[in-house]
Regions:
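N-terminal phosphate-binding or glycine-rich loops at protein starts, especially the Walker A/P-loop
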Residues: 1-43, 98, 107-117, 121-126
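C-terminal non-catalytic interaction/assembly regions of soluble proteins
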Residues: 5-7, 14-34, 256-405
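Gly/Ser/Thr-rich loops at beta-strand to alpha-helix junctions
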Residues: 11-17, 97-111, 191-202, 222-224, ...
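Glycine-rich phosphate/diphosphate-binding loop of Rossmann-like nucleotide-binding domains
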Residues: 15-27, 34, 40-51, 185-235
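Phosphate/nucleotide-donor binding subsite
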Residues: 47-95
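Cap/lid and interdomain-hinge subdomains that line or gate substrate/regulatory clefts
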Residues: 67-68, 134-197, 322, 382
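Short, acidic/small-residue loops that bind anionic groups at enzyme active sites
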Residues: 98, 110-139, 148, 217-221, ...
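Short Gly/Thr/Asp-enriched flexible loops that form oxyanion-binding sites at enzyme active sites
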Residues: 101-120, 202-206, 352-359
Length: 405
């Protein structure tokens, strides 16, 4: 346990005392800490293990160049690129087992950019004054743990010592984990998307895949989830996909918070990864709102509240045609090994018959548009069932298993 190394990222010109304390705490636990300096203007307040000149050189510049015109917008990309290169080289030699960064607004931004470029599974912690708010820009789709600093990270005192010590212990503790992101068998790892309104179906699918000997990674399809799944495809960690929840596309088209960006639904086709698709959750979008307040522009829409602050309007026939158009466009690069299963009795529990968002006209418009627009490389099957029905899920699982066989 004493051979684990934590790289500590900090601006040592302003956070030298705190960085030295963190290094001391990790050493006291039996670990090894390396201080990586991303500070530019002043002299380091403690001796770095990886000095700023080395980081800058690895980022494609020189200390002299940056000091001649010390601008944050010029220095940050260089430090970020240099730190990424250094840490990735260390990872290749099994010389780093966790990364801990800390800072205020700029330090947090730089640490986050570095960690977002590091592989899934490597422990990553940011102790930040920015962690009590919207952290999505810092975490993005990576397994980054953010910890609120409470006070400014400026000097040691009873509070900061305690919190810095906790962060150091957390990083050291994570470094001890024996698990690595790797396949446990020769069989494909299956990626699957899910939403709360089709979870019963997702659980049944997962059970069936496991019984067939496959491991499944399930992603909550609310934006970051779909993007994370596709990044793991690119990195080779996922070899087959049951894309059960395509609601992220609806939010992309109509301005909901679940949008996963323009690349969503293009990756599996380009990589040739076997995929079975279901438009789960496409019939609605998710919008944040004041508690139980219907947004003015959706007064005429059939709707429900998923919870007090998440408003869920039912997309009408024209809205659904637009969603079908985008889904079809994004599957144009698919070269085969892809099937779209259409659940004719409802794309989620919200829109089955007698449910609050049931709209047979909108569903028909959607399904007809998909059948008209989907490329010939995507097989289309109409299933007389709802997306959560066991018969639908079993057909989907069987289809993907047949592709893998």
């Amino acid at each position: 346990m004493n051979n684990k190394t934590v790289v500590v990222i900090a601006t040592l010109d302003t956070k030298g005392e705190e960085a030295a304390f963190v290094k001391q705490q990790i050493s006291a636990l039996g670990g090894h800490a390396l201080l990586l300096d991303i500070g530019l203007i002043g002299e380091p307040g403690t001796a770095p293990d990886i000095d700023r000149a080395t980081v800058i050189q690895s980022g494609g510049s020189s200390l002299e160049t940056l000091l001649n015109n010390p601008q944050r917008q010029d220095a940050s990309p260089v430090f970020i690129a240099g730190a990424i290169a250094i840490i990735n080289e260390m990872l290749g030699n099994d010389e780093v087992h966790a990364v801990l960064g800390f800072g205020g607004t700029q330090g947090t931004s730089n640490c986050a950019a570095i960690m977002q470029a590091l592989p899934f599974g490597l422990p990553k912690i940011i102790l930040s004054t920015m962690a009590s708010g919207d952290t999505s820009a810092f975490v993005d789709i990576k397994d980054i743990t953010m910890m609120f600093a409470v006070s400014d990270i400026l000097g040691l005192n009873p509070l900061s010592r305690t919190i810095l010590s906790n962060a150091a212990a957390a990083a050291w503790g994570m470094a001890q984990s024996p698990f690595k992101l790797q396949r446990n068998s020769e069989k494909a790892v299956i990626g699957m998307t899910n939403l709360g309104v089709i979870t019963d179906g997702a659980m049944h699918a997962m059970k069936l895949f496991r019984e067939a000997g496959y491991e499944v990674i399930v992603f909550h399809a609310i934006g970051a989830g779909g993007r994370a799944m596709e990044q793991l495809m690119k990195e080779g960690h996922i070899q087959a996909v049951f894309d059960y929840a395509l609601g992220e596309i609806s939010d992309e088209v109509h301005g909901g918070f679940r949008s996963a960006g323009e690349e969503r639904l293009t990756v599996a086709g380009k990589l040739g990864i076997p995929q079975v698709l279901c438009p789960g959750g496409t019939e609605h979008i998710g919008l944040f709102t004041e508690a139980n307040v219907v947004p003015e522009e959706y007064k005429d829409y059939v709707s429900v509240f998923h919870n007090p602050i998440i408003f869920v309007p039912r997309l009408n026939a024209d809205d659904m045609r637009q969603v079908a158009k985008v889904i079809s466009e994004r599957l144009q690069h698919t070269s085969g090994n892809a099937t779209m299963l259409l659940p004719m009795k409802g794309t989620s529990r919200y829109c089955i018959e007698d449910a609050p968002l049931y709209d047979a006209e909108a569903d028909s418009a959607f399904f007809e548009e998909l059948q008209k627009r989907l490329p010939r490389t995507v097989e289309v099957q109409l299933i007389d069932a709802a997306a959560e029905d066991e018969v639908f899920v079993e057909l989907a699982v069987t289809k993907l298993l047949d592709m893998l066989d």
